[in-house]
Amino acid sequence: MNYKNREQYKHLMRVLAVAAIVLLECAVFSVFWDRYYASHLWLEPFWDKGNQIIVVIYGIFLLVFMYIYGGMKIGYMKGSSIIYSQMMTAFCANALMYLQIILLWRHLPYILPMVGMTLVDFALAGIVSWLFEKTFARLFPPREVLLIYGEYPMESLELKMNQRPDKYIVAHKVSVEVGEKELCRQIDAYGQEGVILGDLHSELRNRLLKYCYAKEIRVYLTPKLSDIMVRKAEALHIFDTPLLLARNSGLSFDQRFCKRLLDLLVSTILLVITSPIMLIAALCIKLYDHGPVFFKQKRLTIGGKEFYVYKFRSMIVDAEKDGVARLATKNDSRITPVGKVIRATRIDELPQLLNIFKGDMSVVGPRPERPEIAKEYEESIPEFAYRLKVKAGLTGYAQIYGKYNTTAYDKLKLDLMYIESLSLIHI
């Protein structure tokens, strides 16, 4: 199978996977709608076409949120990321449909059927995504790629690429020291399935990129910060020379308004849903050592503004009584047994829903850093302050796509990718 046909077949498989998930979830919604909601409308019950239109609207919601959260990238993203995206899609679509049902009823609709439907959607999306992931792995073998690196060895990147053996195999690697002519020869010999351009100087990287473009060879780049900053630049055609406009002004008023509205809605719903879990966590912390339940600490949010972030206490009392700020390590002796559980399950983060409700934080955004730790990062990476163009978040790209040992520089890149991708449909 040549590479162009392979991509066409992969695209077809993605379309089939998305269609299967949407049709299954629409079928589930149709059953729940007919059984629990359709007969309780304050108007006369819909005719068949009316019920069909409601199901179609639900399907459109699924497609929109699937696009926003990346749920269509089956066979491309990690299986866990796809399942997370599908779960977010089902949650948002079902929440929106529940609000729509409220408008159609005389009183507040039953929420338990909607919760049950959401759980069924989670299971269906997870199973279908897993099945298609396995099918992708069987039908499309991994690409054998050529890694070109600069003055710094790329063992870390090579290791990460090899952690996805279903997608990539670094079959050959070469340093830029061999010269541009030899690099082009190596691309012709070993890079027909793909070339990875590591941390190269811009001039050489651009020439190699043009060479691969002319040869129709797929290229993977480790982006520079400037690459990320112009991702959403606006093309201007005001005369015969093309211009790109990078506004660099943060969120617009309508983006801030919509993001704040969504934060209020999500934080309110989650505070209600998770209140029993938070009560149990608070009792466990108090009973263990009789110390304070909550822990607050200064963090930074938009514009460098300081605020107190709230968490359930997971460490011993006075864990930093010497006044020295230290990041928690993997097997930190200061973490209590209760703390290990609530950290592993992220329950310790739930009080930050109050920060979101107050407006200090957002649901999605760069994680808030302590002022002293942020200062340390900025000494070696001055651009680290760019993360403060938006509110700090409960979760963000660095948490979703990163790992415990992801470098501060890579976390910065991930956070900037989120900031530069913000729009009215991606907030």
Where are each of the predicted segments found?
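Juxtamembrane loop-helix boundary motifs flanking transmembrane segments in multi-pass membrane proteins
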Residues: K4, Q8, G71-G75, G79, ...
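Signature of alpha-helical transmembrane segments in polytopic membrane proteins
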Residues: M1-A137
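Short, glycine-rich, amphipathic interfacial segments at transmembrane boundaries or analogous
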Residues: S226-D227, A233, F294-R334, T395-K411
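A short, structured surface patch at a secondary-structure boundary
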Residues: T329-K391
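N-terminal hydrophobic signal-anchor/signal peptide
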Residues: M1-V22, W130-S275
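C-terminal terminal-structure detector
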Residues: K358, E372, E383-I425
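A hydrophobic, helix-centered structural microdomain
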Residues: Q255-D318, N355, L424
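Loop-to-transmembrane-helix entry motif
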Residues: Q86-A90, N94, L261-V272, T345
